[in-house]
Amino acid sequence: MSQVNMRDMLKAGVHFGHQTRYWNPKMGKYIFGARNKIHIINLEKTLPMFNEALTFVERLAQGKNKILFVGTKRSAGKIVAEEAARCGSPYVDHRWLGGMLTNFKTIRASIKRLRDLEVQAEDGTFAKLTKKEALMRSRDLEKLDRSLGGIKDMGGLPDALFVIDVDHERIAITEANKLGIPVIGVVDTNSSPEGVDYIIPGNDDAIRAIQLYMGSMADAVIRGRNHVAGGTEQFVEEAPVAAAE
C-alpha cells in the first residue's frame, strides 16, 4: 500500500499555515510553532492522519463506494477536476449549489435537464431552432455543465466527501453532516476542524500541496478498485487448480 511520506509533504509545502494572527485555537494541537509570523504545521501529526484518510478512501473504493471531491476555489478547481476524472470519481470544482446533497431530488432533475440538452446539442436539435432559442439553450447547457458536469454520473448520494479548504466549503460539510456522510478535509491553521471526520492538518492554498492531496486521494481510489479487480481475477485463476486437486 503506497502512502504519503514526510519528504512529499515538505516538498509540497504542506507545513506552511496562515499568518499567526488568523489562527484558529481549535487547530493549536497541530501547530509546531511559528516562523516570520507564519504558523508551521506539525507534519509528524499530519502524516499518520493523512495516511489514515488515504486508507479509509482506499477501503471505500474497494467496496465500489463513491467519494465526492470538492474544491471550488480558484487554486483548487482545475486540479480537483483533473484528478477526479483520472480516478473516475465525481467532483464539484466550480460552485457548491445549496442543497446539492440535502435536496438531491431537485439536483437529479437538473442533471436530467443537462443530459437532455447534451443530446439536443449532438443530435442536431439546436440547429433547427431559431438563433435566439439555440443561444439560450447553449447558455443553459454551459451553465448546467459548469455546475453539475462533475456529478452527472454520480447516480445518487456519495459515500464520502473529500474537501480542500473546509472554510470555503462549509456548506458542503454541513450538508454531509446532516446526512451522516463522512467528511475528509484539509484543515489549515486558520480553519475550524468541526464537522470533519478525517482531518488532514495542512496548507490548503499552495498549488503543490493541493496537487499532493488530490493526487494521493485519486491514487487511493484507483488502488482500491484495482484491488477488487485483482482479487476477482485471482479467484478465477485459482478455481481450476483447486478443482484439479
UniProtKB/Swiss-Prot annotation:
GO terms for biological process: translation. One of its GO terms (cellular component) is cytosolic small ribosomal subunit. It holds the Pfam family Ribosomal_S2. CDD domains: RPS2. One of its GO terms (molecular function) is structural constituent of ribosome. The keyword Ribosomal protein applies. Keywords: Ribonucleoprotein, Ribosomal protein. NCBIfam families: rpsB_bact. HAMAP family: Ribosomal_uS2_B (MF_00291_B). Belongs to the universal ribosomal protein uS2 family. This is Small ribosomal subunit protein uS2. It comes from Pseudomonas fluorescens (strain SBW25).
